[in-house]
Amino acid sequence: AEAGLPKAEAAIIGEPSMMECVTGHKGSGAFSFRIRGFEVHSSLMHTGVSAIHEAARLIEWANERNAENRAKTPSPMAAIFNPPWTTMHVGQISGGTAHNITAGECRFVMEMRLVPDDDPEVLTAALRAKIAEIEAEMQKVAPSARIIAAKGHDVPGLVPEEDGPAEQLVRRITGDNADHVVSYGTEAGHFQAAGISAVICGPGNIEQAHQADEFISLAQFEAGEAFLSKVVDSLCD
């Protein structure tokens, strides 16, 4: 705006959608945890604090939230996602010195993927309350024990629009009039939050992402190339 440039009307995010017009995705966020325990010989574990045991309590809390969310009847908005509930997941964890020493430190990363109906601030507040509860119990044994939680990425969800400019453009070019949403996150939510209509449309399948042999088929690559050419042509008309 300061440079006098016009605001974009639409954003097309080229993440893998099999060239379908995806109008919604879950929001996501993450916390990096560093838990400081208190090391003692495991024969006297009642006098120490195992950072790994305390990490397990937080991870089990996340599992309980998953079970609760799964048991809920999804709202119409949530029902279109797969799975139709908010999920919490730990994909990295490390810690400990030896099998016979209570772990002095444990690190792990917890991610969340939220359906549009769930408020990330509410989930974050519940997590922080659980952290405070566990930390207080740890410090009854060892005052130096700590749970340090650093907030990582925060990706807003993409909420389906009613015939937004981006959706209209992509549907006109692809001929895809079906409803599609995904559970992975993209930059689309950021564009939408900034007031720019956004959708996802790109070559490839998310099932091949983050694999040792990650790939995009030649047919999908060619379809993506043809799509971009048509987008350019439509803007030049």
Predicted feature locations:
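Metal-dependent amide/peptide-bond hydrolase catalytic core
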Residues: S32-D237
